[in-house]
Regions:
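Short, small-residue-biased leader/transition segments that mark boundaries at the very start
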Residues: 1-2
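Alpha-helical substrate-recognition element adjacent to the catalytic core
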Residues: 6-82
Length: 147
């Protein structure tokens, strides 16, 4: 349903990969797989990161090599230009996935479940009674898609 489609801003360091800035850390388990599924479901993904210049290009290329493509990078839409926006730099996203979230970053299985079921973090945790480390949700989803 198109009414359920969201614009999702995703941080890079500490969210998609472990914090090793300015280097690129190891992928956080299931990050790229989850992002690819969200893109296949037609959500608009925006890479929202402090990286700039060459460091930003390295992050974009790292994602591309793993099949993750973003609708835009550090802006609301691809054609947006800093010099012509005349308004706040704040993104107009429906959801932000960032390791600096209040309460920290849930695992990517929980993130997918929260988006898919449109539930906030607390009810998901209460339903599952496992706050972190349970990746069975995403593993089941990947298994279904690979059959």
């Amino acid at each position: 349903r198109s009414s359920d489609l969201m614009t999702i801003a995703v941080d890079f360091d500490g969210t998609i990969v472990e914090h090793r800035y300015p280097k690129i850390g190891e992928e956080i388990p299931f990050a790229t797989e989850t992002l690819k599924i969200l893109a296949q479901e037609r959500h608009k993904l925006i890479l929202w990161t402090v990286r700039e210049g060459e460091l930003l290009e390295e992050a974009i290329e790292w994602c591309r090599q793993r099949g993750v493509f973003f609708y835009s990078v550090n802006k609301d839409y691809p054609e947006e230009e800093k010099s012509h926006n005349g308004f706040s730099r704040k993104l107009k996203a429906d959801l932000f996935i960032d390791d600096r979230n209040l309460g920290g970053l849930p695992d990517w299985g929980t993130i997918y479940q929260m988006i898919h079921e449109q539930k906030p973090y607390e009810p998901v945790l209460c339903d599952r009674q496992k706050p972190t480390g349970d990746l069975s949700w995403i593993e089941k989803l990947l298994g279904k898609r690979n059959k």
